[in-house]
Structures are given as structure tokens and as C-alpha cells.
């Protein structure tokens, strides 16, 4: 990098959002600079060492479908793989993997270092250069330089004015062991038009394996066959697999916590930031669920070359000596040694209602925000926002319109719509229950939903595109074959078939119709000579089975989506003055001005906006000749 003065895109932060942003914009042929305060912590897992889970696994698959790195990195570093929710159907089935933190970080950094058009700089950004409400660069006082760019993506995680708490002691820092915290950048941003609040998150103690009695615990091995995250990955890429373990807290544990709540920075009032609802500290669990005598605890190895274990389920910010008592009270951990204490961290976040759905600021052109800075929690939520921000930062540079997925198109669409429409007062976590179209938004079809549009953006290379097109072709061929292949009551396979069925067939039936039966699946079908064919890739026959088995429900959901798209594609003018619309209450006008919805669909989802108010807006648009449709729904 001979010229530090000008870039197309600057990414501030090297976490899970920043790395996806940097890779996306550079793949789209934009000269990109990723600035991080420590290159050795690029891709660091600051909390638990895992990727995926319910709802989160869907986001990882979507990032992969658009050419992102997270799924590939966990395939190369995962040491325990499982599929969750297998009994609840394909829609909510989610992949989760335990990671070797060192291997994961290495995989991410390697991807950055070999990427064309991408440069890395170790430095701390303390200010933005803004002219006429447009960002044009960043300021790095410690090395006395200014770097200019056409767009900037902020992915600062918990480092904006971060404060770490352990008991009554606190100190500045973005995470434990990393005392870098950007209070100056936070203050500069406060001086702009952004609404800024505080959130809190926390992490569990890490212990040494040699003091753990694993014999009294339940063992959790990897699933067989081994799951794979990336659509182009394989289980052969996985390193050695090792188990996780589970145990429980008990009455003694809870008594220790209750006795020392006065030393908790949360319960003593020292912390004002709002905690994550769905990842509560052990103190919160004991207080909120006082009727429970035990809470499950998972022991998660942090890697193949370390004896460090993450004690998942015991997130705490109590003093170190109390943490030691808590750990020693848990079955199997009586002699465990704490390597790193748990802690809580408070940090600044920006109200995401101040962002467009492209994650660009509504006030500062060319400035994009992604990750925990927008009020989310989790590596997966950060990565998903990161790839979206990177795409749109590049499209901004290329003078192309911004892009965002709809709610019916991706969990990423649900994520950004929830954030930008409702905002958040607590760390936002993705769940499958947040999507009204989850039957259509499955892990298995993320590539079918998003890879084509990613190819248009330049995120998918020729080899990946060839593999994807072949998969689509094979799915269609197999569906057609099963649709046109019949078995008859007098066929030689009929006896074996009837063993599979709850009721015998009396007339000819196609392979497609057989797969619609709940007791039938593709593996059983292929045991019949009538339907046997060349061996298909697992992704192909899984997709064929799901598309056929859920066809009736999917058609019904498509009808719902058509109704949703009518309002979603009815666009609202950017400069609309809601005071001009008769019949709107002051409350509704204030809500519209607060959110500045892009469409009737988004406007209708704002809490407190009534159907009558939406009707008034539609009538006004029609009278003004402004009833416009967004024809291209991508």
C-alpha cells in the first residue's frame, strides 16, 4: 500500500461485522482499507467460542450465500458440530458449531490477507472528516494522519466508550485484556445528530480443564453425520472433533449469588446500560427465576491446543473471589481454577432508527454502521449486518442504488427492518420466531434466495456460480423425474413400499405424491427400484424433499407474501411532509417523522400506527399522483 491518502471504502473495526464489510466491498472492486487497533485480534471471539444456533445459524447461511467468510471459517475451525431443533421441522432447524478460537481467527485473517483490493492498517480512528453532511475520511491522531475515502463503515463493537466491570471495580476497555476504548470517537459522534444510548453485555469465567471432574457430567458429542455450514464446504475440512459437557448450578450456587448481590455492579446501580434479555447473567437468572433450584451450565472447550474452557451459562460481573465460590459450588467444578474472570461491559450504541435499511446514516451521506454499534448482540448478527453495509458502501461509491433484502427474502431483511423500524432498547438477538415467513426462510435454501443477487453484485466468483447453477439444475431435474415416475399396485416394489406407509396404495402414485406423505422420506423412496437414480448431492435431495413435502404450506405462504409485497412496494417520497395529510394524529405524525419509513409496508409496522392512518396516507398519495410501485423487488 504505497498511497495512504485515498480509498473507496474505509472499514473501522476488525470484528465479525468489519471483516465481512471489508471482504464484500473489496470483492466488489472497491479499494478498501480495514483499520483495526490490533491486527492480532481480527476475528476475535470475545465471548463464547461458538457460531450459529437458533436463528443465528440462518444468518450464517445467508452470509455464506452472499459470498461471506463466516461459514467457511467455522468449517475450518469447528471442533463440535450439532443440528438444533431437528424435531421441529425444516423451517427452524439450525446449525451450531463450537469453535477453536485460534483456528477461527486465523481463517478470518487469512481470507483478508489474500483478498485483492483490500488493505489492513493497525491504528485507532478518533474522528471522522465530514463536509456538508458527507463523510470523506477518518482522523488517526496517534500517527498524525488523515485518510480519505468515498464511504466509511463503522463496526466498532463494544469499543465505543467501553467500560468493563468486575465487582465494584471498573476500567476503560473494549473487552478484557484489551484496554483500547474510543471515547473521543464516541464524543465526536455524539456532537452530530445521532441518538446514542448505553447497553450492557457480559461474559463467563474461563477455567482450566485440569481441575474439572468430567466424569459426573453429561457428554455432548458432534452429530453424525457431521454438519457443514458453508454451501461449498465439506466435513473433511473440519479439524479434530471433541465433546462439550453439561452440568448444573444448585441451591448452594444460588445462595452464594443472593448473599452477594450487593456487590454486583448491575444490582448496586453501578451499571446503567440495559442487559440482553436472552443471554442473562447468572445473577439475573437467580433473581428472575427464583423458583428454580438449578440452571444448566455448558463447558465449552476454547480450542484443540489450549486447556481453557468457557463456562457457558455463568455470565457474571461479581467480584473475582465470589466468582471462585460460584464456580466451586457447581457439580464437577469443585477444584476448578479460573484463568480469566467473567465481567460485564457497558458501551455506546446508536439508535438504528437513524439509519436507512441499507445501514447508511440518514444524516451523514456515505457513513454506514453495522454490528453491535446498532444495538445487536452476537457474532452472527454482526456478520450479517457487516456484509450488507459492505455491499452498500461499495454501491454508494459506484453511484448505484442501495440494496437491502425484504422480510420475506432473508432473516437479514427481518433483522434490519426490525432495527430500523422499531429501534431497540436492549441488545437485539435473532430468533426464527421473529420472522412471519420462516417456512420460506430456511437454512437449506439461503443460497436459492440470495446467491443470484450476490452474483449480480460481484460477490460470487465463477466457480461458486457454476456449482450453484448445477445445484439448481439438479433440483429441477429430480423434481421433474419424481413427478413423472409412478409406482403401481402390481409393481415389484409394492410390498416394500407398503411397509413404509401407514396405509397401502390402491392406485398408481408418483414419487412426488409419495414424498408428501409424512411417514415417507427421500432415503426410503430411493430404496425402491422404481425410483432409484444416480446418487445425488445431499443438498439436492434435501431440497427436493423439503420443497415437495411442504409444497402446500409454501404455496399458501407465497399468497401471504404477495399481499405483503403490495404494501412493501408502495414507496413513500423521501421528502414527504406528513402534516399535509389530513386525518393523521400528532402522535402518528411524530412516529412517521421519527422513523421516516421508506414504504407503506414499513409505515404499517411502526408501533402505534393504525390501519386508518395508513388508509389516509394511501388516499393522499393517490390524490397527489405519488402512488408509485417499486417494480424490481430485490
Swiss-Prot record:
FAD binds at residues 13-18, 125, 182, 372. Gene3D superfamilies: FAD/NAD(P)-binding domain, GidA associated domain, C-terminal subdomain, tRNA uridine 5-carboxymethylaminomethyl modification enzyme MnmG/GidA. It is found in: Cytoplasm. One of its GO terms (molecular function) is flavin adenine dinucleotide binding. InterPro entries: FAD/NAD-bd_sf, GIDA_C_N, MnmG, MnmG-rel, MnmG-rel_CS, MnmG_C, MnmG_C_subdom, MnmG_C_subdom_sf. Its cofactor is FAD. It holds the Pfam family GIDA. GO terms for biological process: tRNA methylation; tRNA wobble uridine modification. One of its GO terms (cellular component) is cytosol. NAD(+) binds at residues 275-289. It comes from the Bacteria. Keywords: Cytoplasm, FAD, Flavoprotein, NAD, tRNA processing. Belongs to the MnmG family. PANTHER family: GLUCOSE INHIBITED DIVISION PROTEIN A, PROTEIN MTO1 HOMOLOG, MITOCHONDRIAL. Homodimer. Heterotetramer of two MnmE and two MnmG subunits. NAD-binding protein involved in the addition of a carboxymethylaminomethyl (cmnm) group at the wobble position (U34) of certain tRNAs, forming tRNA-cmnm(5)s(2)U34. This is tRNA uridine 5-carboxymethylaminomethyl modification enzyme MnmG. It comes from Blochmanniella floridana. The gene is mnmG.
Amino acid at each position: 500500500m504505497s498511497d495512504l491518502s485515498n480509498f473507496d471504502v474505509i472499514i473501522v473495526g476488525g470484528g465479525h461485522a468489519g471483516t465481512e464489510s471489508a471482504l464484500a466491498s473489496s470483492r466488489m472492486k472497491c479499494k478498501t482499507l480495514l483499520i483495526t487497533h490490533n491486527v492480532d485480534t481480527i476475528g476475535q471471539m470475545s465471548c463464547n467460542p461458538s457460531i450459529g444456533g437458533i436463528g443465528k445459524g440462518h444468518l450464517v447461511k445467508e452470509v455464506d450465500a452472499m459470498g461471506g467468510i463466516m461459514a467457511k471459517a467455522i468449517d475450518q475451525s469447528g471442533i463440535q458440530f450439532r443440528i438444533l431443533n431437528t424435531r421441529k421441522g425444516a423451517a427452524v432447524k439450525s446449525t451450531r458449531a463450537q469453535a477453536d478460537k485460534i483456528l477461527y481467527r486465523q481463517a478470518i485473517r487469512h481470507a483478508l490477507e489474500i483478498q485483492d483490493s483490500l488493505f489492513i492498517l493497525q491504528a485507532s480512528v478518533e474522528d471522522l472528516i465530514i463536509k456538508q453532511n458527507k463523510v470523506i475520511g477518518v482522523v488517526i491522531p496517534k500517527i498524525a494522519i488523515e485518510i480519505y475515502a468515498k464511504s466509511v463503515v463503522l463496526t466498532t463493537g463494544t469499543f465505543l466508550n467501553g467500560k468493563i466491570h468486575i465487582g465494584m471495580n471498573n476500567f476503560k476497555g473494549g473487552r478484557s485484556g484489551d484496554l483500547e476504548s474510543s471515547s473521543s470517537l464516541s464524543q465526536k459522534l455524539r456532537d452530530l445528530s445521532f441518538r446514542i444510548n448505553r447497553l450492557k453485555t457480559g461474559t463467563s469465567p474461563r477455567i482450566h480443564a485440569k481441575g474439572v471432574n468430567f466424569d459426573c457430567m453429561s457428554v455432548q458429542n458432534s452429530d453424525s453425520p457431521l454438519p457443514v455450514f458453508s454451501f461449498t464446504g465439506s466435513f473433511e475440512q473440519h479439524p479434530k472433533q471433541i465433546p462439550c459437557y453439561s452440568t448444573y448450578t444448585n441451591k448452594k450456587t444460588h445462595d452464594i449469588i443472593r448473599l452477594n448481590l450487593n456487590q454486583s455492579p448491575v444490582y448496586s446501580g453501578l451499571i446503567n446500560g440495559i442487559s440482553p434479555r436472552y443471554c442473562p447473567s447468572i445473577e439475573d437468572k437467580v433473581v428472575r427465576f427464583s423458583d428454580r433450584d438449578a440452571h444448566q451450565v455448558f463447558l465449552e472447550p476454547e480450542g484443540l491446543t489450549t486447556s481453557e474452557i468457557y463456562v457457558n451459562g455463568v455470565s457474571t460481573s461479581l467480584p473475582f473471589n465470589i466468582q471462585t465460590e460460584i464456580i466451586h459450588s457447581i457439580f464437577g467444578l469443585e477444584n476448578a481454577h479460573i484463568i480469566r474472570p467473567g465481567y460485564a461491559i457497558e458501551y455506546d450504541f446508536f439508535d438504528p432508527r437513524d439509519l436507512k435499511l441499507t445501514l447508511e446514516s440518514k444524516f451523514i451521506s456515505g457513513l454506514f454502521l453495522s454490528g453491535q454499534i446498532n444495538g445487536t448482540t452476537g457474532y452472527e448478527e454482526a456478520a450479517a449486518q457487516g456484509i450488507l453495509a459492505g455491499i452498500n458502501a461499495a454501491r454508494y461509491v459506484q453511484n448505484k442504488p442501495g440494496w437491502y433484502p425484504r422480510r420475506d427474502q432473508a432473516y437479514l431483511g427481518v433483522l434490519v427492518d426490525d432495527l430500523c423500524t422499531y429501534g431497540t432498547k436492549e441488545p437485539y438477538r435473532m430468533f426464527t420466531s421473529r420472522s412471519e415467513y420462516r417456512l420460506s426462510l430456511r437454512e437449506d435454501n439461503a443460497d436459492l434466495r440470495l446467491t443470484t443477487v450476490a452474483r449480480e453484485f460481484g460477490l460470487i466468483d465463477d466457480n461458486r456460480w457454476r456449482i450453484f447453477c448445477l445445484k439448481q439444475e439438479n433440483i429441477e431435474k429430480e423434481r421433474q423425474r419424481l413427478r413423472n415416475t409412478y409406482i403401481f399396485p402390481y409393481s415389484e416394489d409394492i410390498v416394500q413400499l407398503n411397509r413404509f406407509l401407514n396405509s397401502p396404495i390402491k392406485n398408481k402414485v408418483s414419487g412426488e405424491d409419495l414424498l408428501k406423505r409424512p411417514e415417507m422420506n427421500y432415503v426410503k423412496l430411493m430404496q425402491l427400484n422404481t425410483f432409484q437414480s444416480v446418487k445425488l448431492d445431499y443438498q439436492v435431495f434435501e431440497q427436493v424433499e423439503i420443497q415437495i413435502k411442504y409444497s402446500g404450506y409454501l404455496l399458501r405462504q407465497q399468497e401471504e407474501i404477495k399481499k405483503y409485497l403490495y404494501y412493501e412496494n408502495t414507496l413513500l417520497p423521501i421528502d414527504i411532509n406528513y402534516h399535509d395529510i389530513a386525518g393523521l394524529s400528532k402522535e402518528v405524525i411524530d412516529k412517521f417523522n421519527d422513523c421516516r419509513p421508506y414504504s407503506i409496508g414499513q409505515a404499517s409496522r411502526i408501533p402505534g400506527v393504525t390501519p386508518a392512518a395508513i388508509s389516509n396516507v394511501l388516499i393522499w398519495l393517490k390524490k397527489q399522483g405519488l402512488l408509485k410501485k417499486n417494480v424490481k423487488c430485490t
